[in-house]
Structures are given as structure tokens and as C-alpha cells.
Design a protein with these regions (language model features):
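Short, charged, surface-exposed secondary-structure boundary motifs
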Residues: 17-20, 108-114, 129-136
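Catalytic cores of alpha/beta
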Residues: 1-2, 62-63, 87, 105-115, ...
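Short loop-to-alpha-helix "cap/lid" segments that border enzyme active sites
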Residues: 82, 132-148
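Catalytic beta/alpha-barrel core
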Residues: 47-56, 72-81, 97-110, 121-131, ...
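Active-site beta->alpha loop and helix N-cap motifs at the rims of alpha/beta catalytic domains
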Residues: 1-5, 10-94, 124
Length: 169
């Protein structure tokens, strides 16, 4: 892929700032992957976040189904909340891939892996801003995945990256 990029993720706030309607933006993304011939999340995953104001698993699942029907590249980004974990479990059982985000501790990263989520997105910029060791945080999640057989099943995508050093580490 261009520049070695293996996938992308969306952010509702950034889409809102673009001034374009949400469905327009993700439809343009779907058109782009078709034009590039990289259809399918296996080739080029695009994490698309559901409405961040939803707090009901049924509503999350309903919105996720609509979004995933637009493009086979879309992986549904869901918050690591009680309702979000319930929704992710149901979606994965239906074959709709998920990326569980807003993960702030290694313990939170366990349930997405148990539910077979494709990705988990632990926030690191926030952790470092609060004086925590990001490298140790991600290593702890990786160690948990190694210990419980989740490594390779649920991939870790660091989120809220604020500095180049966080990428290198």
C-alpha cells in the first residue's frame, strides 16, 4: 500500500470538523478502496467509529450493521464500555469485525480479546501525559495476550499517539 500504510481509522470529531456528513465521508472511503482494488478488511482495514454518544448495546449493534453493510473493509470501532463490549461480542458472532477503543488499562484489553475482536486500541498519549510508562502499558497487554493465547487473534493498535517517540517505542 502507499507509504506502507496497512489500514486507517476514523475519528468522529475529525469527520465533523471536515464539514461533510458522516455517511458521505465513509462512502467516499468505500469508493476509494473499490477504485484501488483493495476491498476486504483483510487487505486494508478501515476502522469506522459508531456514534460516540450511543450507550446502549442494541443501538450500537444496529448502527454497526448499517455501517458495515457499506463496505467490506469497515471494522467497527466500539468503545470499551459495558454496552460496547456486549455489542462487540454480538457483532463478532455475526461476522462483523470490531476494533475496541478507549482502552486505558491492560485489564480492559482482556474482554475484547475474549470476544475475538480483530483489534484493540489502547490509548497511549493520554497515559504518557499523566506520567505513565506507555511502553510498559503496551507490553503488559501483549504479555496478557501471550499468556492467554490471544496473540495473533486480536491485534493491538495504539491510539491517541501524540509524539514520534511513542511510535518508535
Amino acid at each position: 500500500h502507499t507509504f506502507g500504510i496497512d489500514g486507517v481509522t476514523t475519528n468522529p470529531r475529525h469527520i465533523m470538523v471536515s464539514g461533510k456528513p458522516f455517511l458521505t465521508v465513509i462512502s467516499e472511503m468505500a469508493d476509494w478502496v473499490k477504485a484501488e482494488g483493495i476491498e476486504g478488511y483483510e487487505k486494508f482495514p478501515i476502522s469506522v467509529e459508531i456514534n460516540p454518544h450511543l450507550d446502549d448495546a442494541d443501538e450500537m449493534v444496529a448502527e454497526a450493521r448499517k455501517i458495515s453493510a457499506i463496505c467490506s473493509n469497515f471494522v467497527i470501532k466500539i468503545p470499551c464500555t459495558e454496552a460496547g463490549i456486549q455489542a462487540a461480542r454480538r457483532l463478532e458472532a455475526e461476522g462483523i469485525r470490531t476494533n475496541v477503543t478507549l482502552v486505558f488499562s491492560p485489564a480492559q484489553a482482556i474482554l475484547p480479546a475474549k470476544n475475538n475482536s480483530l483489534f484493540v486500541s489502547p490509548f497511549i498519549g493520554w497515559k504518557e501525559a499523566n506520567g505513565e510508562d506507555c511502553k510498559a502499558y503496551i507490553q503488559a497487554i501483549s504479555d496478557i495476550y501471550d499468556n492467554y493465547g490471544y496473540k495473533g487473534k486480536t491485534q493491538i493498535i495504539c491510539a491517541a499517539i501524540r509524539t514520534p517517540k511513542q511510535i518508535v517505542d
